[in-house]
Amino acid sequence: MAAPAFPPFRLRFATAATLLGMLGLAGCQTGGYQDSVPPTSGVQPLKGLAQNVSVRRNAMGAPLIESSSFHDALFSLGYVHAGDRIEQMVAMRLLAQGRLAELAGSEALDIDRLMRAANLKQSAAQQYADASPRLKRFFEVYARGVNAYLFRYRDKLPAGLASSGYRPEYWKPEDSALIFCLYAFSQSVNLQEELSALTLAQKAGSDKLAWLLPGAPDEPLAEMEVDKLKGLNLASQLPGLPALAAASQKLADLDLLGSPGSANLALGPQRSRSGKSLLASDSRAAWALSPVQINTSKYQVAGLSLPGLPIVLAGYNGKLAWSSSAVMADNQDLFLEQLRRQGSQLSYLADGKWLPARARSETYFVRGQRPVREVMYDTRHGTLLAQPENASLGLALNLPQFKGDRSLDALFDLTRAKNVERAFDSTREVTAAAVNFVFAEPEHIGWQVSGRYPNRREGQGLLPSPGWDGRYDWDGYADPMLHPYDQDPPAGWIGHANQRSLPRGYGMQLSSTWYYPERAERLAQLAGNGRHDSRSLMALQNDQVTLLANKLKQMFDAPGMAQPLKQAIDALPAGQRDKARDTLARLKAFDGRLSPVSADAALYELFLQEVARQTFLDDLGPESGPAWQAFVGNARLSFSAQADHLLGRDDSPFWDDRNTPQKEDKPAILARSLAGAMEAGIAQLGADRRTWQWGKLHQYRWPAPAYHGLGDAISRSPLAAGGDFTTLALTPFAWGSDFDTHLPASARMIVDFGQAEPLQILTSSGQSGNPASAHYRDGLDAWFKGRFMSLPLQQQNFGRAYGNQRLTLVPGR
């Protein structure tokens, strides 16, 4: 394809200083943008309103919109969303359209190419066209509210937008469908893993690749999947792979290519102290979810909304509570295509015949540069991702089609559902977003998997499939009646933490990769133990116990491991021998509590890092190379080869150290790692092990990955963290690299039907994305102190939660 060279591989986004400099937000500069913060009191006339609307704010800035009509409430929601998060809304729209370079410059071109291949704009147009006239009216009214803000503040935009030189276009109703499509796209996993698998195949070879791609602890190796790559020379046939991997890694860093780490839980009356149901959710996203409450004469709802989309995605309406978590869906596939170029014509091989690829011209407007014009090509499997012209293989991105989809209407209907039965009716029709919906009313709870999942004729979709062989094509989609669901289970609870939610051999495939099972196992332990209330659910969300530590002990003591490990330790040099024995004894005594002040937690995690490096770095290094980065990156997305080898795979070829003449086995590598963990601890934490603390190694770092409105570029001092990637209080790190962790936009919600006002919400992001606002960074302090906010639905309680100060929006002339 005609495409300029990609920029070199970047491990992470720009540093905080670079970002803040680009956006003009550093230090006192925000003071000059104080008039970009909308007022919270007074009167503002707005054209488009029929009657007066009241907007009150609570102590965290969350709005209560009171109106006599739903029309005016939607208009005001658009105005409020834009006032709080216009930069995020603009960035999400540009990202979804493949136009981010207009805001960010040439560094975003590779992201734009990838997003134009996904063609979310076309998907959004289809979904909007299929929406009901009622929903289209809702989106039109909401768009007018957003545009009322854009007109009023056209010369007083937040600093990031104002200094960029980009002038936001007015909001269109279809843009809200586009925001939903981007949200749905981010719920699917495996695209980044497929690209990483190709990178790993180049380094390790297809013969060893299956060992690096486990699906779940009890799943066999995907050897038949790996066979699809045999006979291919990826380095020469797919020369653009490193650049593609770098572009997708940018999106993965922002949690845009699958975002594990969410969890939700519903407990029935028999598991509740009050005798009434409870619901809890914990989500992580690439963007801030904004708390909001709407109260009209015929419609009331409170919960978490996504600015740009006038629908509450998780919340409570006085009768029903609902939330969602990532189902870890694999409903996207890459297809390898054999390419042949003759002059300006590009053809691809399909079942023995060369077919012309459909060409379309794309123009990229780039901030500070001339427009870039390129040609993209479509095959029967989707759009080809950009490759140099000498590539003999291409990668086509195949995504589900959603003609006739009712997801947008169904999501709105969910916010009006009064019971679990109606919630099932609504969520079964959400086919465009693959999530675990969990919902509750006072006496009942339910779970429904939504989405659209391809039927693959052959293969699992774990690796790119040969597009020239129709055996691997999709054959329609799984019957929605096969989608997993449950209602009022005998156990009395329903919970999901991105684990495999289907038994092996089930009649449809949701995914081939799942997150570490220990989070869901711990959730089951806590949910199934005794009775609960909102306080115990808050404690559950903050739980820092890992069950992986106990599995590690069982592995050490297994009949086939205990004696060989002892012999391997005995064979170490004297100094290492004592360290290994000491480490082993400490790990066997460790209770799995990953408190930030725990010395044993520090030693345990040092061992995890050491054994990963001792096992794989000789094959996949150097550390700065694309293979090691892909390997470490995969461990953040799903159950990893690091964990799989730690607990099993005794016959793996990766146990042998290629840098030594002898052949090592698993006990030998474990013995080295036990000694190495102690040595690393002494080097990093000092010789006095009484002063060791996990939180001295494992720290929140700011800013979290952020990019031109996608995430808030807040800078603050590092903070000690507990937990890890296997705990309910999720603090993942790069397994095989370092212990740093980040806090993306996160939100927790608890609904306790036993309380007079059931709904409580906590977000790590401030209500505002504007650095000049008092509510830009205050979410972090509330998050770390566990300071939930109550969103009451009874009018007599509004004053206590929101006060009496209000902004009155009145019809303008």
UniProtKB/Swiss-Prot annotation:
Q: How does it assemble?
A: Heterodimer of an alpha subunit and a beta subunit processed from the same precursor.
Sorted alphabetically, the Gene Ontology BP terms of this entry are: antibiotic biosynthetic process; quorum sensing
What organism is the protein native to? Pseudomonas putida (strain ATCC 47054 / DSM 6125 / CFBP 8728 / NCIMB 11950 / KT2440)
Q: Which SUPFAM superfamilies match?
A: N-terminal nucleophile aminohydrolases (Ntn hydrolases)
Q: What class of enzyme is it?
A: hydrolase
Write down the EC number.
Answer: 3.5.1.97
Top-level taxon in the UniProt lineage: Bacteria
Annotated GO molecular function terms are: hydrolase activity, acting on carbon-nitrogen (but not peptide) bonds, in linear amides
Protein name according to UniProt: Acyl-homoserine lactone acylase QuiP
Q: What else is known?
A: AHL-mediated signaling mediates quorum sensing in many species of Proteobacteria, regulating hundreds of genes, including many that code for extracellular virulence factors.
Protein family according to the UniProt entry: Belongs to the peptidase S45 family.
Q: Which residues form the signal peptide?
A: 1-26
Q: Does the keyword Repeat apply?
A: no
In terms of InterPro entries, this protein maps to: Ntn_hydrolases_N, Pen/GL7ACA/AHL_acylase, Penicillin_amidase_A-knob, Penicillin_amidase_dom1, Penicillin_amidase_N_B-knob, S45
Any idea what job this protein has? Catalyzes the deacylation of acyl-homoserine lactone (AHL or acyl-HSL), releasing homoserine lactone (HSL) and the corresponding fatty acid. Possesses a specificity for the degradation of long-chain acyl-HSLs (side chains of seven or more carbons in length).
Ordered alphabetically, the record's keywords are: Hydrolase, Periplasm, Quorum sensing, Signal, Zymogen
Q: Which residues form the active site?
A: S262
Q: Where in the cell is it found?
A: Periplasm
Q: Which GO terms describe its cellular component?
A: periplasmic space
Reaction equations catalysed: an N-acyl-L-homoserine lactone + H2O = L-homoserine lactone + a carboxylate
